[in-house]
Amino acid sequence: MSQLHAVPGRTKKLPPLRVGVGGPVGSGKTTLVEMLCKTMRERWDLVVVTNDIYTKEDQRLLTVAGALEPERIIGVETGGCPHTAIREDASINLEAVDRMLEKFPNADIVFIESGGDNLAATFSPELSDLTIYVIDVAAGEKIPRKGGPGITKSDLFVINKTDLAPHVGADLSVMEADTRRMRPNRPFVMSNLKTRQGLDEVIRFIETKGLLVG
């Protein structure tokens, strides 16, 4: 949390926890952030930074969905590769986080949703304290065994849209086995966010791994 040791006006002892949410286009990142906000906002002070290449569509979607008050959601237009904006040159996102913390210095959690990217996407440790990587079953049973930093190095790996498995010929047991092999001793969650399956597990992970609770 090197960037956030001193937040002007902050009265809480611990610095805000920055949670990066990444994954390919359509995997369910925005839905996950929306549901996390709606479920956690009564207990924690939350703000969100979204990333899109040429628009602020995810910011708009979260605002329309009522995830948080509009002023607590900021959209970043990266204007290029979404991977670069969260890793090689995260300055635009670091500045957005700073702006949000100027407005809400006592925020407990800053969710940073990346633009849709490939399996090589990772967050800079200067930008994110915890990383969650989301894929969806519809992308294919083989995705977990393809590896890539998002799958092997993320703090939490989420396999979303499990309800689609029978429609796309995916075997969830194979995906689970491949995931255990590719990221031994690292947690993962099988989820269907339409029914909230897996959501509580993600929240427990954020709260415990992020040291928000004992």
Curated annotation (Swiss-Prot):
Protein name, as recorded: Urease accessory protein UreG
Signal sequence segment: none
Family named by the database record: Belongs to the SIMIBI class G3E GTPase family. UreG subfamily.
GO cellular component, one term: cytoplasm
Taxonomic source organism: Leptothrix cholodnii (strain ATCC 51168 / LMG 8142 / SP-6)
Stated role: Facilitates the functional incorporation of the urease nickel metallocenter. This process requires GTP hydrolysis, probably effectuated by UreG.
Entry keywords, A to Z: Chaperone, Cytoplasm, GTP-binding, Nickel insertion, Nucleotide-binding
InterPro entries the record matches: CobW/HypB/UreG_nucleotide-bd, P-loop_NTPase, UreG
Listed HAMAP family: UreG
Any one Gene Ontology molecular-function term assigned to this protein's record: nickel cation binding
Quaternary organization: Homodimer. UreD, UreF and UreG form a complex that acts as a GTP-hydrolysis-dependent molecular chaperone, activating the urease apoprotein by helping to assemble the nickel containing metallocenter of UreC. The UreE protein probably delivers the nickel.
